[in-house]
């Protein structure tokens, strides 16, 4: 074989040998070293073909082209007469990718990053890319304070030019901050400034979730916090001169030093607005008014810019530019703010689209819109639509996107992107207490029936003391104006004695129809009619019950074996709702007030009225709404009319998961006082405490709850992030610590007549409990767990510390 002349060596190991500019004609091309790559594929990637006249430049381009395919580690081009001999060394193919030692970074995240860099099973191994990944991962660990971390790629050769790739992590420990120093501060102490930082060099003993770990991102955020702190207090010349982060020799400790120049405090001398104000100069001037002598405040300046943008956004100017330039006068320590406004083009809405509503029909979402197609874009109207969709409770998230129409200078599409949640639930409840044992309830509720927005519910309870069934249907848009129509049918067979209440049996059934009228965005009124039939029997001689019967013209006897009574009542039902919550379930901001009431109308056997007021206020204490304070109240009052009393079976009760947790359901408040004569269902000497007068039994006190015609319940709740729950499920799980209190009383109780018994007309007998609750929006419906310990209770109260419900939230 003739001596082969070296034309080009590998770009990694040698440089090209230059031949004459005239070159030579290639009559054949041969490859050596190809395994996985086909000859045809290699030839297609080369700029040289058989019959071409090639020179040094052509050979260099050939090598570059072959390297550019990413298939080769080494390329050599040799000449053997008129034949080009291409010697290659293929990059090995990745057969598998594994990880070891990674605790802070999950495997899935690592795989995603590797694939984004082109490193995946079946692809060629690029050692340069692997080295870059090693360095990038180590830089990540350094940014979170793990300076002793290392990442090494271990490549294990396999047959057929394949390799196993294993990334071995040694994460080490997080460096802890030993000290944070601020140099140059005179107006504020270092402790005061550091108290606003996320990073800490000291953690109080009571802060069980705090730590002193260093993170580069947190330091950057703390520096911005420091800058804002000074700018918000008039220090317009404030500057962070430098920041030093020093590492101890063992890489376990960090010292942070921030050098600052405070400067002097400056006052605002005025605000000058210029530019294209789109005819809204008067409104913009109102937003830029300042108080005389007011200190310069960076946050207020930013808010002013945002307010101007929002104002213009309401009039269709979707992309305004607002820029504030402080003009500092060092002589008199004042700042004049020059605000330049460019409203830009006015935009109109071409279409409103919805994405993600696989179940809910478009019409259900579209009827909540306040922004109209064909009208100019109003940012406030778009936001109202988002709020209304959130309040429906059909969606986990609602996001908006304003998209410019290609080719149109003044049109946009508004896109609402929703993520639907399971609006149907199978409701199942269970509770256990030292007094009550186990109780159950069940039902089915669908708040978005077949995507129409109709609410349909079938609920029932079956236990030792109650058989209850209810069918309800509500059309929230009975008319196009948003008037709702709801109806309900129910049946209830209630055995009060088995529920530890005063003994009676009530079999009732009825129906009601309600119309709802929207007043504005946040207020609505309700009005309707109802009918209920009550069949009472087995009524034991109890003071409050007998008092009601006497008011109805009945004269029951304590010796009667079966006191029974029937009523038919027609009621006018009314209500008012104010709802400004930010979402329909698991709210984090806003308030809700709900007033409901009913009064009997002519034709009824009873004459009474009853009113209930529920309030809930959510106050977020951080920008992300992860920490929220919730205050709830429930007030109730009812009484008779025309000399009659409100029926005892309409009484208010408290205790249980929806009122005062830690107490058995419905057991807070007045207890039954019985007439003991010839009572047949209890033994006064054993079950009850009976008073005597002149050797004869008088009245018997019991622990049977009877409720009252007045109720007050309040709760203070602190909602916190749920530990060990990822952000993906944060909107589905809620943890809270609570303090509940409440009382029920009977305003018609005559304490002077029953001086030897508790004063059940006293509203100050307040019960209290505290505990923890967990709520989860599961596929079955909302699950609620609570554990509460009563710490203020009275004789006869029944505790139920642990309570668990499926399908019930508050």
Swiss-Prot record:
InterPro entries: Bac_surfAg_D15 (IPR000184), BamA/TamA_POTRA (IPR010827), D15-like (IPR039910), OM_assembly_BamA (IPR023707), POTRA (IPR034746). It comes from the Bacteria. Its main location: membrane. Residues 24-91, 92-172, 175-263, 266-344, 347-421 form the POTRA domain. It is found in: Cell outer membrane. Residues 1-20 form the signal peptide. Keywords: Cell outer membrane, Membrane, Repeat, Signal, Transmembrane, Transmembrane beta strand. GO terms for cellular component: Bam protein complex. Pfam families: Omp85, POTRA. Part of the Bam complex, which is composed of the outer membrane protein BamA, and four lipoproteins BamB, BamC, BamD and BamE. Part of the outer membrane protein assembly complex, which is involved in assembly and insertion of beta-barrel proteins into the outer membrane. Constitutes, with BamD, the core component of the assembly machinery. PANTHER family: OUTER MEMBRANE PROTEIN ASSEMBLY FACTOR BAMA, SORTING AND ASSEMBLY MACHINERY SAMM50 PROTEIN FAMILY MEMBER. Belongs to the BamA family. This is Outer membrane protein assembly factor BamA. The gene is bamA.
């Amino acid at each position: 074989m003739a001596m082969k002349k070296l034309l080009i060596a590998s770009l990694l190991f040698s440089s090209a040998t230059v031949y004459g500019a005239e070159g030579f004609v290639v009559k054949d091309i041969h490859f050596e070293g190809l395994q996985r790559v086909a000859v045809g594929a290699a030839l297609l990637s080369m700029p040289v073909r058989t019959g071409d006249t090639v020179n040094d430049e052509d050979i260099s381009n050939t090598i570059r082209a072959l390297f550019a395919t990413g298939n080769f580690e080494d390329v050599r081009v040799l000449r053997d007469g008129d034949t080009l001999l291409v010697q290659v060394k293929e990059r090995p193919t990745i057969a598998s990718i594994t990880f070891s030692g990674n605790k802070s970074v999950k495997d899935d995240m690592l795989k995603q990053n590797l694939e984004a860099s082109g490193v995946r099973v079946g692809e060629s191994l690029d050692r340069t890319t692997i080295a870059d990944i090693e360095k990038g991962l180590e830089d990540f660990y350094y940014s979170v304070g793990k300076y002793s971390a290392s990442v090494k790629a271990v490549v294990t050769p396999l047959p057929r030019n394949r390799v196993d790739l294993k990334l071995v992590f040694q994460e080490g420990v997080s460096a802890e901050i030993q000290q944070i120093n601020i140099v140059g501060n005179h107006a504020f102490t270092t402790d005061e400034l550091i108290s606003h930082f996320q990073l800490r060099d000291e953690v109080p003993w009571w802060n069980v979730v705090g730590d002193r770990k260093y993170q580069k991102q947190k330091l950057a955020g703390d520096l911005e916090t420091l800058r804002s702190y000074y700018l918000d207090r008039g220090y317009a010349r404030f500057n962070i001169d430098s920041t030093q982060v020093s590492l101890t020799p063992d890489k376990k400790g960090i010292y942070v030093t921030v050098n600052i120049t405070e400067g002097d405090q400056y006052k605002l001398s005025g605000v000058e607005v210029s530019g294209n104000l789109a005819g809204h100069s008067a409104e913009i001037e109102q937003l830029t008014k300042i108080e005389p002598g007011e200190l310069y405040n960076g946050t207020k300046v930013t808010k002013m810019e945002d307010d101007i943008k929002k104002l213009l956004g309401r009039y269709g100017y979707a992309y305004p530019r607002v820029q504030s330039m402080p003009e500092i006068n060092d002589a008199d320590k004042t700042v004049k703010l020059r605000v330049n406004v460019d409203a830009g083009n006015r935009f109109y809405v071409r279409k409103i689209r919805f994405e993600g509503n696989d179940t809910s029909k478009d019409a259900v979402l579209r009827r909540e819109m306040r922004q109209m197609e064909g009208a100019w874009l109003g940012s406030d109207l778009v936001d109202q639509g988002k709020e209304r969709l959130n309040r429906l409770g059909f969606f986990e998230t609602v996001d908006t996107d304003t998209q410019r129409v290609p080719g149109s200078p003044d049109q946009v599409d508004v896109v609402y992107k929703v993520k639907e949640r399971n609006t149907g639930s199978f409701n199942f409840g269970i509770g256990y207490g030292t007094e009550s044992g186990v109780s159950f309830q069940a039902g089915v509720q669908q708040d978005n029936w077949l995507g129409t927005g109709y609410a349909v519910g079938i609920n029932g309870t079956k236990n030792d003391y109650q058989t209850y069934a209810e069918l309800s249907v509500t059309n929230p848009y009975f008319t196009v104006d948003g008037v709702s129509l709801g109806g309900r049918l129910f049946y209830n067979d209630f055995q009060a004695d088995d529920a530890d209440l005063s003994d009676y049996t009530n079999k009732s059934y009825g129906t009601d129809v309600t119309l709802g009228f929207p007043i504005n965005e946040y207020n609505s009124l309700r009005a309707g009619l109802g009918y209920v039939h009550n069949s009472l029997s087995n009524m034991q001689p109890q003071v409050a019950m007998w008092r009601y019967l006497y008011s109805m013209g009945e004269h029951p006897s304590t010796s009667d074996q079966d006191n029974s009574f029937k009523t038919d009542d027609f009621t006018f039902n009314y209500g008012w709702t104010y709802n400004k919550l930010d979402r329909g379930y698991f709210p984090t901001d806003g308030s809700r007030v709900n007033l409901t009431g009913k009064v009997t109308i002519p034709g009824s056997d009873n004459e009474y009225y009853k009113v209930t007021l529920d309030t809930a206020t959510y106050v977020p204490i951080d920008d992300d709404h992860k920490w929220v304070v919730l205050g709830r109240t429930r007030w109730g009052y009812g009484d008779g009319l025309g000399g009659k009393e409100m029926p005892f079976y309409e009484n208010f009760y408290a205790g249980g998961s929806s009122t005062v947790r830690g107490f058995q359901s419905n057991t807070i408040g007045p207890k039954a006082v019985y007439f003991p004569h010839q009572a047949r269902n209890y033994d006064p000497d054993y079950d009850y405490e009976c008073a005597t007068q002149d050797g004869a039994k008088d009245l018997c006190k019991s622990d049977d709850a009877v409720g009252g015609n007045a109720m007050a319940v309040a709760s203070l709740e602190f909602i916190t992030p749920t530990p060990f729950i990822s952000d993906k499920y944060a909107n589905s799980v809620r943890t809270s610590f609570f303090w509940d209190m409440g009382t029920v009383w009977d305003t018609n109780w005559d304490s002077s007549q029953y001086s030897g018994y508790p004063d059940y007309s006293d509203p100050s007998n307040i019960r209290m409990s505290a505990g923890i609750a967990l709520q989860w929006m599961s596929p079955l419906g909302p699950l609620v767990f609570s554990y509460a310990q009563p710490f203020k209770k009275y004789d006869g109260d029944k505790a139920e510390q642990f309570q668990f419900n499926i399908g019930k939230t508050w």
